A protein has these predicted regions:
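Histidine/acidic-residue-rich catalytic or RNA/ligand-binding cores of hydrolases
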Residues: 15-19, 48-50, 140-147, 167-182, ...
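His/Asp/Glu-enriched short active-site or ligand-binding loop at hydrolase and phosphoryl-transfer sites
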Residues: 156-168
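Short acidic/histidine-rich active-site segments
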Residues: 41, 188-202
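Short, conserved active-site loops that position catalytic residues or coordinate cofactors/metal ions
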Residues: 36-42
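Extended substrate/RNA-proximal surfaces in nucleic-acid metabolism proteins
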Residues: 2, 42, 47-159, 213-222, ...
Length: 242
């Protein structure tokens, strides 16, 4: 398995993570990790940076120490209309966005409202590439329609190792398996992520791989091989400088 890409990682800029961007890059370089996606929390999350931070990611070189850097954000879904907390003038400088629910920003609502919030975000934002930690048991969701719409819009579903390891969003395991099985059923692309808040966890996909092996997820749906991931993003007009 050549799963040497991780698009859900955090730096000290998120306010509750513990390594810098350069420390993350150096770790990846030493470990042979080929693609690092840096995706700090959007500004609506307590402790997170001003949106200028995301707009200014343009100053970060594309390749540092042989590691390809993808400039992203874990954007917060703000409301049922699917609005997120990254303005267009900052979004234009990003390679991708993850859209996620976080309890301090979006209080869990009904199944219909939670589902509509995600669907509306899918429809609104071209830079949305990944739906984050859908297995969170605090948010009831219609997984089937979300996975179908992700497939129709060529959006990846995250298989979040932190959720499965019990480090975050306790009780996500059952829902994560449901989501993964629906991705297999509908042919929706998935991406393994660490959700690392310290560099030692970058590309730790151990629990995610266990789950995908258990359900016999087709390898062609797993997007972590660097060449496959770059081809996917280029097919959507991204990464034209690679």
């Amino acid at each position: 398995m050549n799963y040497l890409s991780d698009l859900h990682t955090h730096t000290i800029v998120s306010g509750h993570a513990y390594t810098t961007l350069m420390e993350n890059i150096d770790f990846c370089s030493k470990k042979g990790i080929k693609i690092l996606g840096t995706s700090d929390h959007g500004p609506a999350m307590p402790g997170s940076p001003h949106y200028w931070y995301f707009g200014n990611l343009k100053v970060v070189p594309r390749i540092i120490n042989d590691v390809i850097i993808l400039k992203g954000c874990e954007a917060n879904i703000l409301d049922v209309d699917g609005n997120i907390d990254i303005p267009n003038n900052a979004m234009k400088n990003l390679d991708y966005m993850i859209a996620s629910f976080h309890e301090p920003v979006f209080e869990p609502k009904s199944l219909e409202e939670n589902t509509n919030a995600i669907l509306n975000a899918i429809y609104k934002y071209d830079k949305l590439e990944i739906l984050g930690h859908l297995g969170n048991p605090n948010y009831e969701l219609d997984y089937d329609i979300i996975v179908k719409k992700a497939k129709e819009n060529n959006i990846m579903i995250e298989i979040n190792n932190s959720s499965l390891s019990g480090g975050s969003r306790i009780g996500s395991n059952v829902n994560c398996e449901k989501v993964a099985l629906l991705c297999k059923k509908h042919g929706t692309k998935v991406i393994l992520t660490s959700d690392a808040h310290i560099n030692l966890k970058i590309c730790d996909f151990s629990k995610s791989i266990e789950l995908l092996n258990k359900i016999e997820m087709p390898k062609e749906l797993i997007m972590n091989e660097p060449d496959k991931l770059i081809a996917h993003l280029k097919s959507k007009g991204r990464l034209q400088d690679l």
